[in-house]
Amino acid sequence: MKKIINIFAAAAVSGALLASGCTTYDAYTGEEKVSNTAKGAGIGAGVGAVIAYFANRDESSKERQKRMLAAAGVGAIAGGGVGYYMDSQEAKLRKQLRETGVSVVREGDKINLVMPGNITFDTNSGHVKASFYEVLNSVAVVLDEFEKTIIAVSGHTDSTGASDYNQQLSEERARSVANYLRSRGIVDARFDVIGFGEDYPIADNSSAEGRAQNRRVELTLIPIKEEA
């Protein structure tokens, strides 16, 4: 008999995965590029933050989510099929998100979608722009097809203003994206919603360009694996 394994166990090897760098795809051309920024403290910082969050959760919350996934009928991927499953999902996401401004980043067996704040939200707003709904609709189609993943939605801000305000705004934005995807039929049990405030920048906050990059919401897709 098979069962869903502890999906958070991946944190034990996260350091090795992040150290190996990641592959990203241009948000407009869809062409593959290896990003030095994505290594270490770059784009990978967001994925690393999510992995650390999962690793530090208490056992009761982990077990509760596993029960919720099972109750919702969410299946798991056989160990040998994880790579192919995530490759297929990545290919569809790249196709759907070409020319949208959303970056697709591959980190080992995880996929990270980076949604820049300027196309997702108005300034200081926690509500998704209506103009971004179509992009989220495209994401939802793929998430619905590839349901054997946890969806960690994390909000990030720049360092301008009070840290408490930035924390609240990051939480509101992450919730807003997650709630929209839920409204498109994505199973609630798959979501973890996290606000990181200004703690995990991917660019230098001393420049306007860097601050713009740091204002973002990320979706980290984590495969749900089976064990014998």
Question: Which sequence ranges carry the predicted segments?
Answer:
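Bacterial N-terminal signal peptides that target proteins for export
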Residues: 1-11
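Bacterial N-terminal signal peptides
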Residues: 10-18
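N-terminal Sec signal peptide cleavage junction
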Residues: 20-22
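Short, low-complexity, glycine-enriched hydrophobic/amphipathic alpha-helices that associate
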Residues: 25-92
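Stable alpha-helical elements in mature extracytoplasmic
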Residues: 46-47, 89, 93, 132-135, ...
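Amphipathic, membrane-active segments
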Residues: 86-118
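Periplasmic peptidoglycan-binding/anchoring modules of Gram-negative envelope and division proteins
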Residues: 96, 121-155, 182, 212-214, ...
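Periplasmic OmpA-like peptidoglycan-binding domain that tethers envelope proteins to the cell wall
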Residues: 156-228
